[in-house]
UniProtKB/Swiss-Prot annotation:
Role noted for this protein: Essential component of the TIM23 complex, a complex that mediates the translocation of transit peptide-containing proteins across the mitochondrial inner membrane.
Membrane topology summary: Multi-pass membrane protein
A matching Pfam family: Tim17
Subcellular location: Mitochondrion inner membrane
Acetylation found in the keyword field: no
GO terms (BP aspect): protein import into mitochondrial matrix; protein insertion into mitochondrial inner membrane
Subunit: Component of the TIM23 complex at least composed of Tim23, Tim17 (Tim17a1, Tim17a2 or Tim17b1) and a Tim50. The complex interacts with the Tim44 component of the PAM complex.
Name by which UniProt lists this protein: Probable mitochondrial import inner membrane translocase subunit Tim17 1
Amino acid sequence: MAEYGREPCPFRIVEDCGGAFAMGALGGGAFQAIKGFRNAPSGLGYRLSGGLAAVRARSGLVGGNFAVWGATFSAIDCSLVYFRKKEDPWNAIISGATTGGILAARTGLTSMLSSALVGGALLALIEGVGIVVSHYSADSYRQVSPVERQQRYKQELLRQQKGVSPLAATYGEIDSSAL
C-alpha cells in the first residue's frame, strides 16, 4: 500500500512534525479560547481578553506537544519502513505503540506500558477503519463486465414490470429469486 502523495522518509518526519504542530496549535487554541472565555470574569470584554490570554499562554505548548508526538511517530515509522522493507498498517500500529511508550517513559514502567497499549490500540483502530472504508469504497470503482451489466438491466426490467421498487429489491424486502 504505497502512499504516493507523501514525501520520502527523511522529509516526512519534518512534514509530519509541522503538520502535527499546526493541528495542535489550532485545536489547542480553540480549546484554550473556550476555556479562557468560560473562566474569565463576567462581561464580554473580560471574557474575550481572558480567552485571548489563554490562547497566547497555552496553544504553543499544546502545538509543541503534538509536534513531538508527530516527529517521534514519523521517525519510528520511517525506521520500520527501512528495516521491514514494506509499508503497511503494522508499521503505523507499532509506531503508535512505541511512541506512546517512549513519550511516557519518564513516568514509570506501568505508565509507559499503558501508554504504549493505548497508542497501539488507537492506531490499530484508525488503521482498521481506514482498511474497511477503502475496502467498501473500492467496490464502487470496480469495472462491471458487459455480461453483468446486461443481467442487472434484465433484473431491473423485470422489477419494473412487476411493480417492485428498486429499494425494496435492494434491501431484501422481496425475494429476488421470485423475479
